[in-house]
Amino acid sequence: MGSRAHRSHPWRDGRNHGAGVSRCLTVHRRRIIMGHSFGGAFVQLLLDAGFGTAGVSIDGAAVKGVWALPFSEIKATFPVLRNPANPHRAVPITETDFHYAFTNNLSLAESKPVYDRYAVPVSGRILFQGGFANVTPNAATSVNFANDQRAPLLFIAGGNDHILPPAVQRENYEKNARRSRAISAYRLFPGRSHYTCGEQGWEAVADFALDWALAPVAGDLGHG
């Protein structure tokens, strides 16, 4: 879709992006799919659509139907959600807000090079899509929690994640585990922030995710 179509249908972008990824995956349907943050929500959408042999959502954004909203998540997303004009533009993030939301396990000095490398103006639209999904008909992040045919799905949570805390991952896991006969699993990594894929010790998270995806098991898998 061109930019004009995106402006005309601002609430469809997430689903259109997922459709594009789906087309790319069609010729490689039997793949392990992993995603972080909103990428975790996209993993759920793709598995729900029949793609993948296993999926791992790492500190994933909530899909429609997940209501957990801890204070730290409100604080981390407020700089974008406070302005109703932000769905229509990219919103920069300050060093202070970045440190709180993503790199809170680091000092401000340690966070600075991470900010310089990775911080870019964020799409306000995608945060509004996620933040208001539960009151949006046909929301872009809608999935069928009762899909018995989807591939196994693991939710990984970071115990010190401010922007998408363990409560979000736990509720998402429980809704899937209760309603679907497909394999659903949950693993908490205590003390890890939203920057879990980049901070020290990331190898343990990556190794666990891959080991699980190669031999999925259901349930609360504890913490490590």
Walk through the language-model features, giving the residues of each.
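Short beta-strand/loop motif that positions the catalytic acidic residue
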Residues: Q149, F155-A157, D161
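Conserved acidic catalytic loop of the alpha/beta-hydrolase fold
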Residues: N16-R31
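Catalytic active-site module of serine/aspartate enzymes centered on a nucleophile-bearing elbow/loop
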Residues: R179, I183-G224
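Conserved hydrolase catalytic core segment
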Residues: I32-V66
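Conserved alpha/beta-hydrolase "acid-adjacent" motif
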Residues: H162-E171
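Flexible "cap/lid" loop of the alpha/beta hydrolase fold
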Residues: T53-H88, F128-V135
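Active-site nucleophile elbow and catalytic-triad environment of alpha/beta-hydrolase enzymes
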Residues: S123-F145
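Conserved alpha/beta-hydrolase catalytic His-Asp/Glu region
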Residues: I93-F128
